[in-house]
C-alpha cells in the first residue's frame, strides 16, 4: 500500500526549537577529561563532544562490546542464562579485575555475565569468549565484525578484556557511546549493570560494583568502568529519568573522582536541558484520493518516534502537516 510521509514541525510557545538538539561547544561545560561525549539514547543525538573521535585505549570499557555479544546471543537463543561455562586454564590465569576462577570451575552464564558487569572480571570475560567462540581470538574477530556493522570507524579490538595495550586495541568516546547505546537497547543487561552489591559461589564471594554512580546517581543504569596505567580512568555511564536516557562517556580521566564528576556533569546537563517529544500520538486520518483505484489511502508515520527538544518551561507541541491529496 502506498504510504504518505507525515512531516512534523515542533513549536514552543515563544520560539520554535530545532527538532535536533544543538550540541554544546567545548567550554560551555567544564569537563576535565581530554575526551568525552554525551549522547541521548532514543534519538542518538550528540549534545556534547570533546575530542570524541580520538582513538584511545579503553581498558575495561572494552567489555561493553563483550557484553553486547553475550546479550545478543542470549536473546537470540544461542545462549541460556542457566548454561554451564567451564573455566579453562587460560581463563583462570587472568589477573587484574577478576573473581579468581580456578581451572575447571563451572559457573552459569548468569553468574559469568554478572561478574563481568559488576566487577569487570577478566577471567569471566575470557571464559565466556571461549565458551561462545572456542577461542578468544575468534571471539575478538566477531567483536570487530560487530563494530563494523555498527559503523564504528575508530575502533579495533585485539582482546575481549581491555587488559593489554598492544597499540592496536583502541576505540573512541563516540564509538563507545554508539556501542553503549546498542547495549542498553537490551533491557536484560540492566539486570546486571544496576547491581550495587551481590555475591557468587553461594554467597562465599562478594561483588561490589566498580561503577559507584550506580549507588549515588539517581537513575543510573550502568554501564562500564575501565582503568589501566595507560588508559587512565575511563567510563561509559548511562542514566534514565522520566523516560529519557543519556550516555556519558569519559576517556582518560586522571582519577576516579574526576571521571565520575565529568560523567555526572554531562548527565546533569542532559536532564536539565532537554526532553523527548513524542511524534506519534495522534491517530492519522485517511487521505482522499482523486482518480485512484480506491477513494482513500492510509496515511502512515515515517521517521522517528521522538524528537529531542530543549526544555523551555512550556509543553512541546507539534504540528502535523498532511500531503496534498
Regions found by a protein language model. Name each.
Residues 9, 13-17:
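Hydrophobic core
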Residues 1-9:
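Positively charged n-region of N-terminal signal peptides that target proteins for export
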Residues 5, 13, 28-30, 77-79, ...:
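A generic structural signal for short, solvent-exposed coil/turn residues
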Residues 15-16, 76, 278-281:
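Residues in and immediately flanking transmembrane alpha helices
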Residues 2-3, 41, 50, 63, ...:
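Basic side chains
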Residues 152-156, 164-325:
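Domain-terminus/edge residues, biased toward the C-terminal soluble/receptor-binding domains
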Residues 21-174, 178, 183-185:
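Active-site-adjacent loops and short helices of periplasmic peptidoglycan-processing enzymes
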Amino acid at each position: 500500500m502506498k504510504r504518505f510521509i507525515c512531516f512534523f514541525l515542533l513549536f514552543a510557545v515563544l520560539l520554535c526549537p530545532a527538532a535536533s538538539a544543538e550540541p554544546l561547544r567545548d567550554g560551555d561545560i567544564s569537563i576535565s577529561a581530554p575526551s568525552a561525549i554525551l549522547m541521548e539514547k532514543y534519538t542518538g543525538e550528540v549534545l556534547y563532544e570533546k575530542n570524541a573521535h580520538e582513538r584511545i585505549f579503553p581498558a575495561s570499557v572494552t567489555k561493553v562490546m563483550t557484553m553486547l555479544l553475550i546479550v545478543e546471543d542470549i536473546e537470540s537463543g544461542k545462549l541460556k542464562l542457566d548454561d554451564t561455562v567451564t573455566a579453562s586454564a587460560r581463563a583462570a590465569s587472568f589477573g587484574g579485575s577478576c573473581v579468581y576462577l580456578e581451572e575447571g570451575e563451572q559457573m552459569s552464564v548468569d553468574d559469568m555475565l554478572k561478574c563481568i558487569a559488576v566487577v569487570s572480571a577478566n577471567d569471566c570475560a575470557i571464559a565466556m569468549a571461549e565458551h561462545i567462540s572456542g577461542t578468544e581470538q575468534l571471539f575478538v574477530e566477531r567483536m570487530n565484525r560487530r563494530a563494523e556493522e555498527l559503523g564504528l570507524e575508530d575502533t579495533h579490538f585485539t582482546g575481549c578484556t581491555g587488559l593489554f595495550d598492544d597499540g592496536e586495541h583502541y576505540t573512541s568516546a563516540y564509538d563507545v557511546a554508539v556501542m553503549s547505546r546498542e547495549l542498553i537497547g537490551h533491557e536484560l543487561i540492566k539486570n546486571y549493570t544496576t547491581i550495587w552489591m551481590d555475591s557468587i559461589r553461594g554467597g562465599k564471594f562478594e561483588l561490589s560494583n566498580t561503577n559507584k554512580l550506580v549507588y549515588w546517581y539517581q537513575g543510573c543504569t550502568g554501564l562500564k568502568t575501565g582503568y589501566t596505567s595507560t588508559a587512565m580512568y575511563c567510563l561509559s555511564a548511562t542514566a534514565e529519568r522520566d523516560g529519557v536516557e543519556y550516555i556519558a562517556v569519559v576517556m582518560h580521566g586522571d582519577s576516579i573522582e574526576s571521571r565520575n564528576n565529568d560523567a555526572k556533569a554531562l548527565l546533569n546537563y542532559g536532564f536539565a536541558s532537554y526532553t523527548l517529544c513524542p511524534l506519534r500520538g495522534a491517530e492519522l486520518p485517511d487521505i482522499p484520493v482523486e482518480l485512484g483505484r480506491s477513494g482513500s489511502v492510509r496515511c502512515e508515520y515515517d521517521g522517528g518516534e521522538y524528537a529531542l527538544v530543549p526544555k523551555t518551561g512550556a509543553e512541546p507541541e507539534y504540528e502535523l502537516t498532511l500531503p496534498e491529496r
